Amino acid sequence: GTLLETRPDIAVVAEPTDLDIVVAHRGATRWEIRTTGRACHSSVPSNGVNAIYRMAQILACLEEFADKLGDLVPPHPLCGGATLSVGRIEGGISVNTVPDKCTIEIDRRVVPGEEGMEAFNQVEAFLRDRIDFDYEMIEPWLVAATLNDDRNGEWADRLMSHITPVAGPHEKVGVAYGTHASRIDDGGVPSVVFGPGSIEQAHTKDEWISVEELQQAAEIYFQFCANVG
C-alpha cells in the first residue's frame, strides 16, 4: 500500500543549493571489507599473520582502482565522475599483538546511469583478480540511488520561472552529493532539489543562511506552490 491516496505531481526537496535547481546528483554505495590473520605476540611476528598487512595490499589495489575509475565509468555531464574513497580503518587490539582482524569502510559515489550493486560487484571483480588470500566483501549497508534529469525537466523549468523574478538568473545544475530526492523520484514522483544557502556551509560547526536568501526562497516556494496547478 501507499501512504498517499494521490501521488504528488512534483517534489521539491529543500537543501542548500544557492537558489539554483539541482536536477541530477550522484548516489552512493557503502560497504566493509574485512581481512583476517593469526594473532601472536609482536616480539615474534613470524608466528602470526598480520591482518593489517593483508589489508594494506587491498588498499593499494583500491587506490589503483580509484585512479582508473575515470576510464571505467564515463563522467556525467552535470554530476562529474564516479569516485571511490576509503574513509575508515580499524584493526588490532594492542601494539604488542600481531592483529588478526582489520576492517575498512568504502564510499563509492555512482553517477546517473550506474547502479549501486553493479559498482560493488565491479570492485569485487577487480580485487578478485589481484588478491591471492581470503577476505570478506560485506554486502553494502547503504545503496543510495542517483537523481537523473530525465523526468524533472518540465518541473524544473516551471520552478525557474518563479526564481528569476525574485532572485534573478539562476541555473539548473548537477551536484556530487546525494539527497532524499532520489528516493522520492524512485517512488515515481519527479523531484528536484532547491533551497537557500550553500552546501559549503553544510555539516560545519557554523552553519548559516543569509536572511535575504532565506526570504527569497520562502517567496519562491510560495509562488511555485500557489501556481503549480
Q: Residue spans of the language-model regions?
A:
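Acidic/histidine-rich catalytic neighborhood of metal-dependent amide-processing enzymes
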Residues: 1-30, 229
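Metal-dependent amide/peptide-bond hydrolase catalytic core
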Residues: 23, 30-229
